[in-house]
Each structure stands twice: as structure tokens, then as C-alpha cells.
Amino acid sequence: MSMNKKIAIFPGSFDPFHNGHKHILNKALALFDLVYLVITINPDKITKTSFDQRKTLLENEILDFDKSRVQVLVNKDSLTAEIAKKLGAKFIIRSARNDIDYQYELVLAAGNKKINNEVETILIFPDYDKIEINSTLIRHQKFIENLKK
């Protein structure tokens, strides 16, 4: 891998990976040569699908992306900043839809910087029409749809 490549990781529980994530990924690819989508644990969330299921679903969602620029990894036991260091990524991609997300991301960014001083967190803001998309809402909608069946 070239030393000049701008490498980023885009971590998330991705349960599920949705159009909002895809939108942020597209924006990240305008800035970076390689983006690792890292399926990881979020201690603040209860996931509904296994790592393997999420990896398969995510890989199917990104079939139209250049495989040399987007790769999917599973992280079960390392901190995000440690994964970035192992992969040679100098950037962590995150997104914030509102002030609550922003405050949360601010704390995460500071923690990641303390663990890995070489990493910078890049917040990519969604376009206006994508602001309301989130995984929890999608899971709740699916749950309600299943109740109606």
C-alpha cells in the first residue's frame, strides 16, 4: 500500500447498514483513497443480528462500490483507535445529525485521540434529507411491521 494513501475507518454497529451510512460512505470516498467499514461493538446499543450476519448484509449493500476502495472488517475486541493504528488509518469517519450526536462524538473523538495520538476524527454531516435516518428507527419500524402481520 502506498505511503501516500489517505486511509480512514468508518466504524459502526451497522445494525442495519442503511442509506444514511451509504450516504456518509460516499462522502468519505470523495476525501479518502481507502475506507474500512468496521463492524464493531457499541456498548450503548443492543444489536439484533450477529457480527457474521451484519458482515454479509453490509457486503451485499456495498456491491456497487469499488472493492479496492471499500473493505468490510469485523472488530469484536479492540478499541476503535487501536484498529485505526493496526490498519494504518489516520482518520476515523463519524457523523452527527444533531447536537446530541455531536456531544457524543466529541467525547469519542477525545478518547480515540488519547489512545492513538496519530488519529483524527472527521465528522461528516449528512445532507438535510438524510438527517432523520438512523438504525434504531429502522429496527423499530421493522418490529412494528412484523406485529401487523
Swiss-Prot record:
Tell me what reaction this enzyme catalyses. Answer: (R)-4'-phosphopantetheine + ATP + H(+) = 3'-dephospho-CoA + diphosphate
Q: PANTHER family given for it?
A: PHOSPHOPANTETHEINE ADENYLYLTRANSFERASE
Q: Does the keyword Transferase apply?
A: yes
- Annotated ATP binding lies at 13-14, 21, 105, 130-136
**Alphabetical list of Gene3D superfamilies matching this protein:** HUPs
Q: What does this protein do?
A: Reversibly transfers an adenylyl group from ATP to 4'-phosphopantetheine, yielding dephospho-CoA (dPCoA) and pyrophosphate.
Which branch of life, at top level? Answer: Bacteria
Gene that specifies this protein? coaD
Q: Which named protein is this?
A: Phosphopantetheine adenylyltransferase
Instruction: Tell me the lineage of the source organism.
Output: Bacteria, Bacillati, Mycoplasmatota, Mycoplasmoidales, Metamycoplasmataceae
State the InterPro entries in the record.
Answer: Cyt_trans-like (IPR004821), PPAT (IPR001980), Rossmann-like_a/b/a_fold (IPR014729)
